[in-house]
């Protein structure tokens, strides 16, 4: 089977060299890792970005390409399956070029529904029950499903040798004002120490008990490991299922998530207060009891086991198996 993943645009907001890797084992992109995890020996796969010029053959059956312009590109690679990561109109010319391929769309965030210009998908993946319900109402003839967003398992795992220097990990770019900095920094109690991994917000200062800096994605796990637990507080109108949820669970950190975040709640959060399985992962809370929940998690760290839950329910292997089964059942 031939797989094609449309990955998006070569980064415009940072150095494109940050996503250049010589070995697939070093690649920090979860979507490249997911595609690679789906492959059998007899399969072939390509991953495309637009807005660049690069070809990297990672293995005998997996190639990454940066293509200057999708609209004018004529491919000799004929995909049986096309996975669209992101809901970009730039993909439409590629999708129309291969009318018989099985087309999967995972837009997420604001782009969670197909946009005008192309609707002929065979499967639409969603982050949350709310998004799935709307999608089924708008596109009742297209199969749609909830989907787990894993972490790059080649990088995100516990580092027990690293000392815990902070109570809380808050991985969120301050340049994106929907990530929750205003709420977190304006209400953070003084007894907690917090590490913010991301660009500093420009519109206000962070408290004295906050340390903030940006690291490359490949370096994040070792900085996450400096913390005892994690928090997520994004704006639900813009983002959905932030990747840091799976990444912190994969690193073994229990999490507290604001209840406005759009994600598959029952899949990621197994509460210690009301457990659904033997491995608790964290708590889903309102703004009113957010910091009370943080204190509760810190007081009960040894009762959570997010790493084991992640391996059994959220890993790359689980996500890849899910997609292969969907493809087999629905079409190819």
Regions found by a protein language model. Give the residues of each.
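Conserved catalytic-core segment of nucleotide-activated headgroup transferases in glycan assembly
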Residues: 20-24, 31, 37, 153-155, ...
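Short alpha-helical segment that forms part of, or immediately flanks, the ligand-binding pocket
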Residues: 221, 245-250, 264
């Amino acid at each position: 089977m031939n797989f094609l993943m449309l990955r998006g645009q070569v980064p415009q907001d940072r150095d494109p060299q940050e996503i250049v890797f010589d070995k697939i084992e070093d690649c920090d992109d979860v979507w490249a890792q997911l595609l690679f995890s789906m492959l059998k020996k007899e399969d072939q796969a390509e991953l495309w970005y637009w807005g660049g010029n690069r070809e990297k053959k990672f293995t005998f059956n997996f190639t990454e390409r940066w293509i200057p312009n999708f609209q004018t590109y004529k491919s000799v690679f004929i995909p049986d399956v096309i996975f669209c990561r992101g809901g970009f109109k730039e993909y439409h010319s590629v999708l129309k070029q291969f009318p018989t391929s099985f087309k999967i769309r995972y837009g997420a965030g604001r782009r969670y529904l197909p946009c005008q210009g192309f609707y002929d998908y065979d499967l639409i993946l969603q982050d949350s029950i709310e998004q799935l319900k709307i999608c089924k109402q708008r596109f009742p003839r297209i199969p749609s499903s909830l989907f787990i967003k894993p972490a790059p398992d080649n990088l995100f795992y516990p580092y027990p040798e690293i000392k815990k220097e902070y109570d809380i990990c808050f991985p969120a770019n301050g340049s994106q004002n929907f990530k929750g900095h205003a709420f977190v920094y304006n209400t953070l109690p003084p007894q907690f120490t917090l590490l913010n991994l991301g660009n500093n917000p420009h519109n206000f200062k962070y408290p004295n008990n906050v340390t903030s800096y940006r690291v490359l994605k490949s370096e994040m796990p070792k900085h996450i490991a400096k913390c005892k637990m994690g928090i997520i507080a994004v704006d639900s109108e813009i983002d959905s299922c932030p990747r840091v949820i799976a990444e912190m669970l994969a690193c073994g950190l229990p999490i507290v998530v604001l209840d406005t975040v759009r994600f598959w709640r029952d899949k990621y959060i197994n509460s210690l207060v009301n457990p659904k399985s033997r491995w608790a992962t964290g708590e889903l809370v309102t703004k009113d009891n957010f910091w009370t929940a943080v204190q509760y998690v810190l007081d009960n760290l040894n009762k959570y086991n997010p790493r084991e839950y992640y391996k059994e329910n959220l890993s790359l292997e689980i996500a890849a198996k899910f997609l292969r089964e969907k493809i087999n059942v629905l079409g190819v």
